[in-house]
Design a protein with these regions (language model features):
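Long, C-terminal-biased catalytic regions of enzyme "large/alpha" subunits
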Residues: 1-190
Length: 190
């Protein structure tokens, strides 16, 4: 039911963009923008207005765009099936991302499978997220989720590379509380 409603709303927006393009002889489009700062601001405002609603305003952030929530455990195939139909409607920009575990640099088939999902589900743009750690003292690298101590030299000077909000970052020190909460809620798509 939520999927049908979401597609109906975004289809209406797409129709209006097409109508305005014809009427004004300018390009109008629908963009599935992340609006990262708003995901936390809107929950705060909505909680003040509507109170705490389980599964909605009780979180510190809203899932942005038309993504499956980051904490929803599902396969990449299921995620693509849900999110793919929106890509044709949001031609101004969109992204499909998949969280994978393990070391993607040594698993090209996992990447190829995700590219096949993109093709099958008419997905225009994708990111594959996975952990990448590097010891800043000896150069050891791996893809463990919570590496704190280098197994080679014992150093705690570990650079943790992650993709957040479209950027590869080694630290989350400057991210707002909503983005940090979202990051901690992320699950691997298996």
């Amino acid at each position: 039911e939520a999927q049908r409603l979401g597609l109906r709303i975004v289809s209406h927006m797409r129709s209006k963009a097409n109508e305005f393009s014809e009427r004004y002889n300018h390009n109008f489009s629908v963009l599935a923008t992340p609006a990262e700062g708003l995901s936390g601001k809107f929950t705060t405002k909505d909680r003040k207005t509507f109170g705490s609603i389980p599964g909605i305003t009780d979180k510190i952030y809203y899932t942005n765009s038309n993504h499956v929530p980051v904490y929803y455990k599902c396969s990449p195939r299921h995620k693509a099936k849900i999110e793919g139909p929106y890509h044709e409607l949001t031609r101004g920009g969109h992204i499909f991302y998949v969280e994978i575990d393990g070391d993607a640099t040594h698993n090209p088939q996992a990447i190829a499978d995700i590219v096949d999902l993109m093709d099958t589900n008419n997905i225009g743009y994708c990111s594959v997220n996975h952990n990448r750690n590097r010891c800043m003292d000896c150069g050891y690298e791996d893809a463990q989720e919570n590496l704190e101590v280098c197994p080679t030299c014992g150093s705690r000077h570990i650079d943790k590379l992650q993709r957040i909000t479209g950027y590869l970052v080694g630290t989350t020190d400057r991210w707002n509380s909503a983005k940090l909460a979202e990051l901690s809620d992320r699950v691997v798509h298996k």
